[in-house]
Structure formats: structure tokens, C-alpha cells
């Protein structure tokens, strides 16, 4: 059949008559089952024109021609069985009383797999004779993708025995599909193809893995690739397994008189647990123990009576699982190392905050005291200098009639005022009387308004200011410090 098709194609792809007539067609067409497809056919009638007597569409079946549709100018249009309900001429002019047969394209509706074949469009002309061409129609079938678990529930078994957990089927596809698996499971697949009588192919792929609790609820995806199109379907594995049990609640710090302690039985199982049972290996359960399914509650304060080993048994339809815990009761609570570290860190933080607050308070206090003393001790112009007995000049800038002091008059803070006064009295240079300020009413005495005397009296420091008469008025305070150049400045200026 392939040889005949090839021969016909070589002869008829562009069959040109002696006068230039030919039939134009596409070499191949394709469609999916249930869809619609057009098979074009056009007649090129060159000069001189010829008369078209009839157009016949034929299906080539096993080397023989089977009529599909006929268009005759005199007899009209006819579509034969089994194509009558699904095949028609596309151009309405073909069906007119005076038809135009240059374009006799036919349309297939509800395409079937059996429609796949080679179709011939044949023109009968006068006087040129017959002209024809052919087209190959291919029909595709999209597969039905179905994925399922091997059984609704899979029971976990031996760790070395793999079993089929899921099956993916791409049924009745044309051409055949390619099946792959997408999953995190450590399994393998087995794929086989089955050819069907209608020319389609069914592909089946089974996935094998060792069923266990670890793969429960894992996703398994089947990917079917067909004609560069991908179809996916997924299932979630349902693995049944016996309970795996642990007991929580004992923290290693159950001490006498502790309140609200309990043990909880936690079980990982599929299906769920149907029965919980508690056992006390040291005898019967203590009187303070109360059973509430998976929880064992101890009422009242902790006593030595509840010490011992407790066992929880959990059961489901697949099997049973157990776990135990040994409860130890101590006289005093024990604090974990982590708690001690947290407390120590908290103490460091609190101590640091206290120290910082204390330092800040002390600094503020010192600052306030310093400012207050400074205000009490000196209120004047720091740039003021008092001449005293020895720089060779009077306050007005005149040369004094007496020689300058041979040395500076300097006193320490703790010098006795009587000694200071005696020293001044014994000096021949002074040559005058010394009087206390508060008893002196001489109008010739001029006190520089530094504010020292008044402020000292107001602050009650009991300090005395002495006035020395030597050509010009001079005042000296015990808080004033004589300098080498004969001037005297306050202690604050001296420190600066």
C-alpha cells in the first residue's frame, strides 16, 4: 500500500495536462478525533478553458478507491455512506443550479480514527480528460490520563520489600504517550505499552516504593507527554502504620509539694489511636493519678508515692506501640544551668543599671555643689587685678614713694588668719595701720566692688577682708593669692 501511495503521489502531485490544466491540493492534513478538518481541492483551468463534467472525491482503501462525494453540473451533489452525515462541500457555489466547480474543498466533521487515509480529488473534463491529485489525512487521538493508588490504603510492611503504590495510565492515545514521574520518593517505575485494534496505544506505568510512615501523605505526580503537550495528575499516598509512642511531661524537676504535674502519651499512627492504656510497673497506679485517655494527671502536691516507671500503650487497627518514662521525685527543686545563666545575666544588667544611675547622680551632685560654691566665693570680673605692695606702681599708675616688696605674700589655705595679720603688721613696708573692714569708716578707703566682702558675709564663711593703706587703697582677702608681679588674683583665677 505504501508503494502504491508513493507511486500515485509521484504521478499526481501536480498533474498537468497538455493544455495546462491541473488540480491543486495540500500534500497532508491532520486533525484530532472529534474535531473538524478541511481537505482543499482547486482546479486551475488555463486557456483554452475546458468543460468540467464531474468532480469525484475518493478514499483509497487497501489499494482500491471508495467514493466519498460527487459534484455533477447536471445531477447535483451527492455524498455517499458512511460519510453522508459528516462530509460536505465547503463552497456553496458547488450546490447551486448552475454550479461552479473550480473549488471543491470538502469538510470532515466529528473526525474518526477510521477517517485516516489517502483521499483523491478527481476532475473529469472535456476534451482534456481526467485530472486528479491526492492528500494524506492523519487522525490523532488524545489519550485519557488516569492516575490511582494501587489500593485505597497501603499498609507499611518490611523495610526491604517494594510494592506498587500508584499507577498512571495514558489510554487510547495516538500516537503513544511518554510517562514520567515527579516525586521526592526514593522509588522506581515500570512502564509498558499496549496496542489497541483501532490503532491507538495505551501506556501504563507502575510506581514501586517501600511503604513506610515516612512516605505517608507524600505527593506523587504522573506526567504524560503527548505530541509535545504535557498532562499531569497527582495522588497523595495513604500509608497505614502502627503507633509510634512517646511520653511527655516529666522534665526531671518533680520535687516535693510541686503542683499540677501530668504525663501525656503522644502517638504517631495511621489510622488514629483507638485505645490508650497506662501501666505502673511499680504496682498499682498511685491514688492521686487520674486517667484521661492519653493524659495521666496527678492531683494535689507531688509526693514520693508517685515516683516510679509509667508505661503508655497505644493501639490502632494496624497494631500497638508503647513508651515508658521513669519519674524521679526530689526533695528540692533543681534549676537548669540555663535558668542560672539567665538569672546571672539579669543580675548583671540590673547591677550595671544601678551603678550607672549612681555615677550619674554623683556627677550631677558635684556639678551643683561646684557651681554653688563658685557663685558664693566670687562675683566679679575675672580680669580685675589688685596691685599689692610690690609691683612698683600704684593703682592709678603713679610711682609709689616706698620700695616694693622683696618677696610675694603667699598663704596656704590652712594658714592661721592671726599669723597672716601679724605678718602684715610686722612689715615695715606697709607702714600703716590695718583695720577690719567692718570697723573701718574712713572715706579715703575705697573698696573695689568685687563683691567678695558682701558675698562672704552673706555665705557666713567667717572670712575677714583686710585693708592696707599704702599710698592708694588696697584690699586683700584670704581667698586672694598674691602674684610675682605684685598683683593679686582669686583662687579661681589661680587654678585656671
Swiss-Prot record:
Location within or outside the cell: Cell membrane; Cell junction, Adherens junction
Its membrane topology: Single-pass type I membrane protein
A GO-annotated cellular component: plasma membrane
Residues making up the signal peptide according to the UniProt record: 1-20
Domain (Ig-like C2-type) ranges: 143-238, 243-330
Any GO MF annotation of the entry: cell adhesion mediator activity
Disulphide bond pairs: 41-121, 168-222, 265-312
GO biological process, one term: primary palate development
Database matches in InterPro entries: CD80_C2-set (IPR013162), Ig-like_dom (IPR007110), Ig-like_dom_sf (IPR036179), Ig-like_fold (IPR013783), Ig_sub (IPR003599), Ig_V-set (IPR013106), Nectin/Nectin-like (IPR051427)
Name of the featured protein: Nectin 1a
Gene: nectin1a
